Amino acid sequence: MKKTHKDTCGTSFHGDTIFISVEELINLLGEPQFQENDGNDKVNYYWDCETEDGELFTIYDWKEYRPISDFEKIEFHIGSFTKEISEKVKSKN
């Protein structure tokens, strides 16, 4: 998986999450497209990504409502166009 600049608008949560830290995600994907780690919004971080096959997905924290430490492992949501894509992403992590 890699970060993408393709349009991920329309992806949604299909029940799949990954348990990982912000630091691990930055090492894996680079800096997030959105970073507002103040806990005031539903999302502090998100990445737009694609699989090796070009399937689009997003990774984001959801409703933590607090600043997140770079080293703290939390559940990040996977947003995608289908359940199959989000399951594929989850299985690779």
Regions found by a protein language model. Give the residues of each.
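Residues within mature, well-folded domains
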Residues: 1-93
